[in-house]
Amino acid sequence: MAYTINKYSGATLVVVQDGTVDVTTDLTFVGKNYAGYGEIQNENFLFLLENFSGTSQPPKPISGQIWHDSTSGKIKFYDGTKFKTTGGAEVSTTQPVGLTSGDFWWDSGNSQLYTYDGCLLYTSDA
């Protein structure tokens, strides 16, 4: 009998058939009676424990997924479109795409802090 894997919202993410694995997301879902499930299950727990810590973002994120960017040392979350910093400012030399009202951007090329109001960016000295 297949396992139906539901999101927290109740929506079905995937159906995993007996004896198979599903790699739709950054975790591997194991079907009933899959030989060798133990290593997969334990790695899944480790990935969750370390918040997918690495120098590059997880390749198959789902909305709400947490990632520890080990290069910047920041915790980020996936908003359904991109990974966003969970606090503080977005840091880059170019204006980040997808800013929402109240977001900060630190222009590391010009050492300038900006605040976004939903339409315009304002400098911290304005």
Regions found by a protein language model. Give the residues of each.
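Conserved small/polar residues in nucleotide/adenosyl-binding loops
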Residues: 122-126
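Extracellular "spike/adhesin" assembly and maturation modules
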Residues: 1-119
